[in-house]
A protein has these predicted regions:
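Adenine nucleotide-associated cytosolic modules
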Residues: 1-247
Length: 247
């Protein structure tokens, strides 16, 4: 049941026929995990809070640095040196005090990933390296948690929605495994744009709608302002999601 304040706060969302009060109630009872609070994570977390996702867990192991401020808009100069998860929790709570925001200051590893994502209904990728993404991908496949992958570089970005048992996983897309990350340049508006698509796909899942990018890879190129969507196929010999592995 939505109270009077919630009916007022989310009024513009409630007017959407595909959303309505039932969709808002579902969001209120949902739990999203945002792993990585860089340019992607800052933006997606902000819109989850604004939209009324009731429970949000933020995971990161880094502190705010001056070089973050061109794209990580939750942090200001006065926050330099502070833990990102705590700064984000503090500021997001001021945007919407009704949301439970849980900070986890930790680096994702193969040993801790299962305990960290326990209870997630959707895991949203805010990471900056493929090695950690593949760890999260494997855990989500095993626990049957939808995983919204995204990556950005320079003026480009991409996103896909991974539904365990139904779509290709990240290891299908990157079968060769780990590669370097975090060293490429990026303009701040690119992660913000892609992260908003992540938030939209997540919200669709949480309110019971079909995501638009399941089994599809959306690419954006800011150089010519073009979008491209490609079908992606499951790798039947994937070491993570093939039937032989998951059964």
């Amino acid at each position: 049941m939505l109270n009077r304040n919630e009916l007022t706060r989310y009024h513009r969302q409630l007017l959407i026929p595909e959303f309505g009060e039932e969709g808002q109630r579902r969001l209120k009872n949902s739990h999203v995990f945002v792993i990585g609070l860089g340019g992607l994570g800052c933006a997606s977390a902000t819109y989850f809070v604004a939209a009324g996702v009731g429970h949000i867990t933020l995971v990161d192991f880094d502190v705010v640095e001056l070089s973050d401020l061109n794209r990580q808009v939750l942090y200001w100069e006065e926050d330099i040196g502070e833990k990102k998860v705590l700064v984000a929790q503090r500021k997001l709570s001021k945007l919407n005090s009704t949301i439970e925001i849980i900070p986890i200051f930790a680096k994702i590893t193969k040993k801790n990933v299962f305990s960290i994502i326990d209870g997630a209904q959707v895991v949203v990728d805010g990471l900056d390296n493929l090695a950690t993404r593949l760890i999260v991908n494997s855990a989500c496949i095993k626990h049957k948690i939808p995983y919204i992958y995204a990556g950005v570089s320079r003026l480009r970005g991409m996103i896909t929605t991974i539904i365990p048992g139904k779509t290709p996983c990240l290891a299908c897309i990157y079968p060769e495994g780990s590669r370097g990350g975090g060293g490429l340049g990026v303009l701040g508006v690119i992660p913000a744009l892609i992260a908003n698509f992540q938030a939209l796909e997540s919200i669709k899942l949480l309110i019971g709608q079909s995501p638009s990018l399941a089994g599809k890879l959306l690419r954006f190129n800011g150089n010519d302002m073009k979008f491209r969507i490609d079908e992606i196929k499951r790798n039947e010999s994937c070491k993570v999601c093939s039937q032989e592995v998951v059964k």
